[in-house]
Amino acid sequence: MDEDTRAEYESTSQQLRIDLKTWETDWAKSHEGKKPGRGDIKANEDIAAKYKQYNKVRDILSGKISPPSKHAPKSTKRKSDGLSAQTPIKQNKHIETPAKNRTQNHDEDLMNTPAISRKLFSPTSVTSVGPTPQRDGQVLGLFDLLVEKELGTPSKKDSATKTGSARKVDATPSKRSAATDDDEDERLGRTPMSSSKRQRLDHFLTPLKNKDGNKDAATPSSVSKLQFDTPAFLKRNTLPVLEENGDFDAPAPLRLPRKPFARGLSEIVASLRKVEEESLDDDLDALRDIEDGGMGEPKPKTLFPSKPKDDILVDDNEARQLPLGGFDDEGVYDSPVEGDNPTRVYKKKGQKRTTRMAKMRPVRVNRPENMAANPQSDVENDEIQAGGEDAGSDFDDIVEKKPAQKKEGTVKKAARKVNELAHANFQRLKLRNHGAKGGPGINSRFRRRK
């Protein structure tokens, strides 16, 4: 918006604002100092129009609405014609059957540009898939359709084409020649044969001599005219003509992708590390000079420095702290296994053990001295003691003590005998999750077969 237009809109807005303020002041005086509401503004059509115009001008100045053009475009809406006074005349439709054009000149089709080839080979977008073209139950290919439709299929023999004159329906019938009558009578006088019989008999017949061989003689057309070659837009690239007698050229060198000129991050880190190591080596050399000579003359540098002595017998287990972090040199750890730096192979963890492990170890238990009382065992022990190793010796003089007789009393129920040699491995465990996987018949070799 130029300055003149803006100044014009600003003056219009100022004038409208003065008019509206004057009306509001008069309204307030006549209505005890109250401001007019929406209903009061709408009741006065002149003031309502000024309010709308004022808001529109302010929106144009603020840029919310583009200013209207001075030359308003004329509406191109079509105006409806007035109603006609009289009834329109009904249009007569043609009831007669349209005549069929029976004359077909195939020579003109061959001379014109082949439209079928253009349709077949042009890259048009497929809108719908049609039925597969067939003939006598056999699927026709792309080039079969091309040849048939362009050159014409000799399936239907037209008598008008044979004689070379087009039939005229409306013309007066002319008298046929005698030769034509003879051919017609000969054709009608023969007994018709089936196509299979005629085809079988043709193998044994001598072919008739072509009396007029140059009647339909013509220069054979080239393959390019039949549109059998690949169209130009479908050819990928044209190959040069090969010389059969010439020597084979050496194969072109393989172009490998070049490395980028920009330095990689690992290369930058390695170069910075080298710079830091050189500065640290200089500091160490200065410290050694101070320790050795007490700030004396520096030692002359030799052309071939001697190798440091191998005083380190065992490497330090702690990893060396790198100042910048990352790799020591370029190309380290670029591949999974390189040199003496094999990567750690992680083993996939499987399912943990679900049964309780019990290691079977021999348990040494001393037999208790007081075993369960058995009368037979006591008698046997007494007999063994009576006739033992010391029988018949000096100990025979010792008076043998008679065993004390036990008093007969009430028989007590014997407690349940527990063998002390029973091992904990043969105890039944009370597992809380027993049967959680479906009971004893699940995943068992001894379950009942279905």
Swiss-Prot record:
User: What keywords would UniProt list here?
Assistant: Cell cycle, Cytoplasm, DNA replication, Nucleus
Q: Which Pfam families match?
A: Drc1-Sld2
One molecular function GO term is:
DNA replication origin binding
Chain intervals for the UniProt region annotation (Disordered)? 59-137, 150-223, 288-413, 428-450
What superkingdom heads the lineage?
A: Eukaryota
In this chain, composition skew of type Polar residues spans: 122-131
GO terms of biological process kind: DNA replication initiation; double-strand break repair via break-induced replication; mitotic DNA replication preinitiation complex assembly
Question: Can you list the disulfide-bonded cysteine pairs?
Answer: none
Composition-biased stretches, type Basic residues, lie in 345-364
Where does the record say this protein resides?
A: Cytoplasm; Nucleus
Record GO cellular component, one term: DNA replication preinitiation complex
List the biased-composition ranges (Basic and acidic residues).
93-109, 150-160, 199-215, 398-411
Q: What is its main location?
A: cytoplasm
Matching entries from InterPro entries are given as: DNA_rep_checkpnt_protein (IPR021110), Sld2 (IPR040203)
State its role: Has a role in the initiation of DNA replication. Required at S-phase checkpoint.
Q: Which family does it belong to?
A: Belongs to the SLD2 family.
What is the protein name stated in its UniProt record? DNA replication regulator SLD2
* Species, as recorded: Gibberella zeae (strain ATCC MYA-4620 / CBS 123657 / FGSC 9075 / NRRL 31084 / PH-1)
What's the gene? SLD2
